[in-house]
Amino acid sequence: MRKYDFISALAKETAAEVVKNREEWMKYLTTAARLYKYPFREQLLIYAQRPDATACASIELWNERMHCWVNKGAKGIALLDEDEAHGKRLKYVFDVSDVHAARRIGRYPELWELHEEHKEDVIKRLEQTYGATDDKKLFEERLMEIAERIAVDYYEELLPDLQYMIEGSFLEGLDEQNVGIRLRETLSDSISFTLLSACGADMQEYGSEFAFDFIHEFNSMDTLAVLGDAANELAKPVLLEIGRTIRAYNRSHEQEQTENLTQKGLANTSETVSYTHLRAHETDQYL
């Protein structure tokens, strides 16, 4: 079997696996939440080959933009590459754990991490785009409120595509209303789970919120692609905005700390050197 055919078959096998039950779907979403910049079909293949991946890129991007080199013996993650110019072929990406930074000039991706001090700024920023949420609720519950609102706003646009694809799946034979209910609820829960997972929520605590009662009915590649593409494309701008807000908060906070040190006349003391060393150590983890 050609490698391309093998990877194509792997995608189909993985699609069948992740919709077996809620546990399998949540395992997939946990990986997808870290790789939200990738399209659904590529997320699926990365999950199949490296479910622990956190930040993937082509060898060209690692070399040319990040000045990182792939470790000897590292195995690339194969993805399907279909374009009219070159036909069907494979392309490869490598996880950040597969590379090392060149001395002095190498850098790693800046992977944001949400902490308690970020939550107020994040929710305020999201409310500017997605509308007000219940300020009596916890941050995680307000994210779920936003996710549900997004799903309700968009699922009807997706419904005709899903209706066209349901032949051969467990959705076949259902009327439009019931197909719509299944899409809306599964989409809402998928977006919610993705947002909470990416934000570091305790999924042991919040996992019970997501029944995913209908996930097994999206049991064809076509129906799952409608759901998976939508969940990814709708969660992605939310996560990008969260990341931007966290980085802005961190930059502002770091600037304040630097100004405070300068005002105290510590800019050229050993304490400042220690602070600079600490910042350099922290930056090693990020872009």
List each model region and its residues.
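N-terminal accessory/interface modules of nucleic-acid-binding and processing proteins
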Residues: 1-274, 278-279
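Single conserved hydrophobic/aromatic residue that forms the stacking wall/gate
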Residues: 277, 282-287
